[in-house]
Amino acid sequence: TVAMAIGDALAVVWMEKRGLSKKDFAINHPAGTLGRKLTLKVSDLMKPSNQLNPLFKDSSLREVISEITRGSIGSCWIKERSQDNKLIGLITDGDLRRALKNYDPKKWETLVAEEIMTNDPIVITSDLFAIEALELMEKNKKKPISLLPVIDKDNEFIGILRLHDLIQAGLN
């Protein structure tokens, strides 16, 4: 452990002398703790779409509750029935709680996903660095973000990244 501490100290001195940033260090030492944290991509941590069932704009409140309860991400993604995997909305457990609070219980039987979903949620791509996704979640003070849909270049839903996964990976 003493040798490791001396090695770390020498690495820090070398970084400062060379004017290297943490990112430069991470690129040169991807297997180290710092390197791993700074080079992880969203694709390394996201839950892929083939593990998540889509719902549709006309899905009932009962279907939304069932899917959010069945899954392990606290949300469900919404798409058009006629389109491939184009994301048109997202319903989180928070959206669900707000809907139950704001709508008259008599309306619950007729509520559909389109009425409670977040239209145009903030999305990311799988090639984004995970640390950048975390920064995006943290900087949104207006409405806390605990998960981000992941899309490809064709705007198709390919997965979801949870704050929980980022924290488990040591990004906090």
Q: What is the predicted function of each stretch?
A:
Residues 54-73, 79, 100, 123-146, ...:
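The conserved cystathionine-beta-synthase
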Residues 16-46:
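Internal, active-site/partner-interface "lid" segment
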Residues 73, 86-103, 156-172:
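Short beta->alpha transition motifs characteristic of CBS
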Residues 7, 37-40, 47-50, 70-73, ...:
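Short gly/pro-enriched beta-turn/loop segments at secondary-structure junctions
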Residues 10, 45, 68, 85, ...:
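Terminal peptide-recognition signature
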Residues 107, 111, 135-136:
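C-terminal non-catalytic interaction/assembly regions of soluble proteins
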